[in-house]
Amino acid sequence: ELPMNYANIKYFDIADGEGVRTSLFVSGCRRGCKNCFNSVAWDFAAGEPFDRAVEDKIIESLDHPFIDGLTILGGEPMEPENQAGLVDFVERVRAAYPAGSGKTIWCFTGDVLEELMPGGRHHTEVTDRILACLDMLVDGPFVQDLYDISLRFRGSSNQRVIDMNATRARAEREGVALCDAVELWRDDPVYSTHTM
């Protein structure tokens, strides 16, 4: 089995999630959204092999008080072969920086959460392990006709910024699947003082 490749790593990234982050762009995506911002990463062979030394460098980069966490995007992190290449790494990051440590893990996917549920198009034997480590999941394909420059952390209005911790808690409380318990992230100060 070939190792996963990565197209780029951005240290001190302020565009792809809250705060200052290390962002890993994995290689490989079969979706081919029109006007994708990163079509260079569609090719699974693009970039360099994602090996243990690269993992170590990323984990080390998170060990600064001014770094808020890791963002995984691409390419498509949830392509089945990329999930296989990411699962151990994501669990290593979560073990090094547990929930509540102040370091968050964001993931951007062209899949909707429903496609990552059991029976879904991109659900594999490791999907649940990856989802369990995520604080935020930005889901849905980029749709040029729904492009909106005013949106934070997403390109088109169909995409959702899902608060995975709140979603997991609600799913457990209500005894339903994650996709039936979606809690959206809110960053507008209006929301912090009003219950919706």
Which residues are covered by each model-predicted region?
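Glycine-centered flexibility motif
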Residues: G17-G19, G28, G47, G69, ...
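Auxiliary Fe-S-binding modules of radical SAM enzymes
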Residues: N5-A15, D63-P65, R94-M196
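Ubiquitous "structural anchor" signal
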Residues: F25, N82-Q83, D148, D163
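Hydrophobic pocket-lining residues within nucleotide cofactor-binding pockets
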Residues: C29, P77, F142
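N-terminal pre-triad scaffold of radical SAM enzymes
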Residues: N5-G32
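Conserved Radical SAM active-site core
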Residues: L2-Y6, V20, N35-R121, E125
